[in-house]
Amino acid sequence: AQSKNFIEDKEAGLVSEVAQGGTNFSGGQRQRLAIARALANDPKILISDESTSALDPKTTKQILALLQDLNQKLGLTIVLITHEMQIVKDIANRVAVMQDGRLIEEGSVLEIFSDPKQPLTQDFISTATGIDEAMVKIEKQEIVEHLSENSILVQLKYAGASTDEPLLNELYKHYQVTANILYGNIEILDGTPVGELVVVLSGEKAALAGAQEAIRQAGVQLKVLKGGQ
């Protein structure tokens, strides 16, 4: 009954078209009708297989909003099969990554996007965040091409409470290490802020070592991309 009421609310505009055979349905209308039909028997799980792959961005958002309504208002579990990582970020709570028919990694959206373990997952995440494209441009910058002996190029990843800390200011205050931000990105994933920076850190060798340790102690992932030999 709950699903029936939901269908009536969401699909009222489609009723007349269904009566006429639905010959003029758009891609988005077809997807909404397919969802309505799937709800007819009050299922506990709804499987959505690449349901937005052929839709324009506006219609994609509408379909995702409909699926979120189903999840939140009906308590319906939705298994969303997709290759579009932006959709995963927008709607999912948990993620399972498949390769050659095998499950290779699973976890919360926050876990997968902030700390992917498998190479395939890492490739997906790098593409979704735009870091690969950004790195091509960063590596061509003069400050990186001619990195000084007292500097290192690092990638920082942080999530949750660590995004609230004025970390780079603290590095200068305690270690006299300066930070030149070359790239930055922050997103909200499942209600949690997740950020990524590419930074040139400059200072004395011992100070740089101390700064790196302080960054890790603050719960921030650090990867040295260049320098520090």
Model-derived regions, located:
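ABC ATPase nucleotide-binding domain "signature" region
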Residues: 33-38, 62
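Catalytic Walker B motif of ABC-type/P-loop ATPase nucleotide-binding domains
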Residues: 46-49
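A short, surface-exposed alpha-helical micro-motif characterized by mixed small hydrophobic
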Residues: 88-90
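Conserved "ABC signature" C-loop
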Residues: 1-20
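Conserved signature/switch motifs of ABC ATPase nucleotide-binding domains
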Residues: 41
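ABC ATPase "signature
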Residues: 106-107, 115
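Helix N-cap at the start of a conserved alpha-helix in ABC-type nucleotide-binding domains
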Residues: 57-59
